[in-house]
């Protein structure tokens, strides 16, 4: 089994893997990434994922599916240089041989002076609605807005 937890992991893997062998089953944590997998490798690839919206997805939802299917003997977990260890640990706890591999590197977002100006102007308007699905994305957002303290308050407090 190969687990691709994000669209970024799919994009990185697709750069190197043009087609998966028939005996490989792919898995991911949600429907959005499943669509990216289908776009990269077609509808015939074996794919396991929790169906539904964000409330029905995530590592925990995929774990429930995998538990009921039985432990995969070997798992290759392809991700960025950081990420939650929870799902690999759960798989190890039921006997899977899990290898976690970094296949892409996250680079911090640095706003240009123009982007800083734009976001500062936006901070004088209505508070944003931001939907973020990973702690790494939260870290990237706060890294990007750190030079503009008013924006951090605007994002965190709705002020």
Regions found by a protein language model. Give the residues of each.
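Conserved beta-alpha
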Residues: 1-159
């Amino acid at each position: 089994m190969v687990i691709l937890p994000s669209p970024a992991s799919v994009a990185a893997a697709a750069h190197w893997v043009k087609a998966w062998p028939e005996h490989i089953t792919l898995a991911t944590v949600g429907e959005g990434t499943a669509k990216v997998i289908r776009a990269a490798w077609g509808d015939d690839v074996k794919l396991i994922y929790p169906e539904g919206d964000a409330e029905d997805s995530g590592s925990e939802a995929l774990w429930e599916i995998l538990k009921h299917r039985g432990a995969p003997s070997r798992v290759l977990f392809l991700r960025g240089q950081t990420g939650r260890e929870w799902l690999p640990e759960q798989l190890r706890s039921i006997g899977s041989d899990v290898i976690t591999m970094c296949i892409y590197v996250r680079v911090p977002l640095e706003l240009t002076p123009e982007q800083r100006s734009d976001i500062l102007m936006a901070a004088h308007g209505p508070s944003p609605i931001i939907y973020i699905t990973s702690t790494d994305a939260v870290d990237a957002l706060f890294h990007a807005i750190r030079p503009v303290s008013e924006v951090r308050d605007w994002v965190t407090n709705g002020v």
